[in-house]
Amino acid sequence: MKRTFQPSVLKRKRSHGFRARMATKNGRKVLARRRARGRKVLSA
């Protein structure tokens, strides 16, 4: 059986990267939430 997680740096960055987050209003909310929580890493 093929595993579900097939890593790809490009896909990872495009869907979960910092610029992808900044591109939408809700993505910016995600970053704000993670900053408020004190996350060391904000995005992938």
From Swiss-Prot:
GO terms for biological process: translation. GO terms for molecular function: structural constituent of ribosome. GO terms for cellular component: ribonucleoprotein complex; ribosome. It comes from the Bacteria. InterPro entries: Ribosomal_bL34, Ribosomal_bL34_CS. Coiled coil: none annotated. Keywords: Ribonucleoprotein, Ribosomal protein. Belongs to the bacterial ribosomal protein bL34 family. This is Large ribosomal subunit protein bL34. It comes from Idiomarina loihiensis (strain ATCC BAA-735 / DSM 15497 / L2-TR). The lineage of its organism: Bacteria, Pseudomonadati, Pseudomonadota, Gammaproteobacteria, Alteromonadales. The gene is rpmH.
